[in-house]
A protein has these predicted regions:
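Short, small-residue-biased leader/transition segments that mark boundaries at the very start
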Residues: 1-3
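Surface-exposed loop/interface segments of Gram-negative outer-membrane beta-barrel transport/assembly proteins
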Residues: 5-95, 106, 136-141, 147, ...
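Transmembrane beta-strand segments that form the barrel wall of outer-membrane beta-barrel proteins
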Residues: 8, 129-135, 381-393
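Outer-membrane beta-barrel initiation region
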Residues: 102-106, 116-120
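Transmembrane beta-barrel architecture of outer membranes
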Residues: 111, 143-149, 366, 400-404
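Outer-membrane beta-barrel architecture
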Residues: 113-117, 128, 151, 245-247, ...
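Residue-level signature of outer-membrane beta-barrel architecture
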Residues: 118-120, 131, 154-155, 248-250, ...
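Short glycine/threonine-rich loop-to-helix capping motif typified by GTGT followed
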Residues: 395-399
Length: 497
């Protein structure tokens, strides 16, 4: 048994490139000109809220930044982070050039791994465990992952070999940041952030005296506070997954082999969505919990035959079968409106949870064969066939067969061609591909309803004579090369229906 082997890796992440944001003009529109009789008469101006005497209007309600040009010598009435309202004293009109960049941080990924290997003259085993910790470029994001793997192989006899492999992964994400154009996305906030807004003004998250009830949104109720998005509107998740397989290979003789194999992929995933009170979409708060369990089990058996004959014919053929089972089970419950701010439990909802379930089960049994013939490396023939039996199709249509055949010939091995021609190979094929459908598409089923003790009739028109999808592809072409492969043309014509 060898000594454990340790390996580690550390990397840092940072924003690679920023858009060329402008910091020449502040919040406002070109039409924001001081009216007659005001202190800003005839000039571009800025005002957080309207003047106390009503002599000029507010310009802080727009996300556009085509207003007054920045000038530290000009004084405007701006936002006051102490009072969380309009300042009583005019302050210099300046830009805050880091009011987007300061929202980000330098992230890192740290990976530690230990592996142990053992060998003998008839087998080997290897085990490893890896821990990965990631802090992303946005605060309160990142993940931890633990992966344990073991693999072993043993030569039981000259003819029989056993292989086993298993991998388990646990992944925990404290918060998966939202993406795209929505109110809980930092990208959305960056679009509407104005150059005259100091990011520090938003750090308190909540209005004074209304903690956990009213988020601080000085400029627009349509844009979430970025720190509330990062620290309160969380999307945590935990996932356990396993991939395992075992196989046995039997060499019957010099021409025949037999293989049997079974493998499983399974995962258990728990996801949550937290939305605080005063969220842009869910003003009274929101909580959702979702559990997903799914697995796929595959078992195969395969006979293989290979032989060469004195006349130049080589044959490789195999025939076997597969049994596949799939299962998907999802249970989700959500509440709109929270009784106690900041408590994310289904029991904390102001009403009964809305429960949703999705269960899908599928089985597919298959028999298949493939045969490859080669004659003196100048004529090739490939033939395949597969028959599936699917549980998702009606009983009368659940069996479907799809074959393929292809032939190719190296013409310069059959005929004497000009020496300038390096290769002329022609080919043609006919192939079919079959496909079934998702579970529960042949008959109507009732769905769950928000109203207790009731169900919903599906609006989908189901087909009790659902047939498998069979697509047919025709292909022909040639590969032509000249002057020792310096010039070539590969042509293919195909038709699919």
């Amino acid at each position: 048994c060898a000594l454990p082997i340790y390996s580690g890796n550390f990397s840092i992440d940072d924003v690679m490139r920023w858009p060329d944001y402008q910091y020449e003009f502040g919040q406002g529109l070109p039409s924001n000109i001081g009216p007659a009789g005001s202190i800003y008469e005839g000039q571009p101006y800025y005002s957080y809220g309207k003047a106390e005497d009503g002599s000029y209007a507010s310009t802080s309600g727009t996300s556009s930044a085509y207003g007054a040009r920045f000038d530290a010598n000009r004084l405007f009435y701006q936002y006051d982070p102490v009072t969380q309202g309009r300042a009583s004293v005019a302050t210099p009109w300046v830009a805050y050039k880091n009011n987007r960049k300061d929202l980000f941080q330098t992230g890192y990924t740290l990976t530690n791994s230990v592996a142990l290997t053992g060998k003998s003259d008839r087998g080997s085993v290897r085990a490893s465990i890896t821990h990965t910790k990631n802090e992303w470029i946005l605060p309160n994001t990142g993940f931890q992952r633990i992966t344990a793997m073991v693999s072993a192989q043993q030569q039981i006899s000259r003819a029989l070999r056993i292989n086993f492999k298993s991998s388990y992964t646990y992944r925990k994400l404290n918060n998966t940041p939202a993406l795209g154009y929505n109110s809980n996305s930092i990208s959305y906030f960056l679009i509407f952030q104005n150059p005259n807004v100091n990011l520090d003004w938003l750090r308190p998250m909540w209005r004074t005296g209304q903690e956990n009830v009213k988020q601080l949104q000085p400029y627009s109720s349509f844009i979430g506070n970025p720190y509330v998005i990062l620290y309160e509107s969380e999307n945590p998740s935990e996932k356990h997954s396993n991939v395992s397989s075992i196989s046995a290979n039997l060499r019957i003789n010099s021409k025949f082999d037999f293989m049997i194999r079974s493998g499983i992929q399974l995962s258990a995933d728990q996801r949550e969505q937290h939305r605080p009170i005063s969220d842009v979409v869910f003003g009274n708060g929101f909580f959702k919990k979702q559990n997903v369990f799914d697995y796929e089990l595959n078992s195969d058996a395969l006979f293989t035959y290979h032989d060469s004959f004195a006349n130049g014919l080589r044959v490789n053929a195999s025939a076997g079968g597969n049994m596949m089972q799939q299962s998907y089970d999802m249970l989700a419950a959500s509440v709109v409106g929270l009784i106690t701010p900041g408590v994310y439990k289904l029991a904390n909802g102001v009403s009964n949870p809305n429960v949703q379930t999705v269960i899908k089960k599928k089985a597919l049994n298959s028999l298949y064969f493939t045969a490859n013939f080669s004659y003196k490396d100048k004529l090739f023939l490939d033939v395949t066939g597969r028959n599936d039996w699917s549980s998702t199709l009606p009983k009368s249509n659940r069996s479907f067969f799809y074959p393929s055949v292809s032939v190719s010939a190296v013409m310069n091995e059959w005929f004497t061609l000009p020496e300038q021609i390096s290769l002329l190979k022609v080919r043609g094929s006919l192939a079919q591909v079959g496909n079934d459908t998702d579970p529960y598409k042949t008959s109507p089923y009732y769905g769950t309803s928000d109203f207790p003790g009731s169900a919903i009739v599906s609006s989908t028109l189901y087909n009790q004579d659902f047939k498998p999808e069979i697509s047919t592809n025709y292909e022909t072409g040639f590969d032509f090369r000249m002057f020792h492969n310096r010039i070539g043309l590969d042509f293919t014509f195909y038709y699919n229906r």
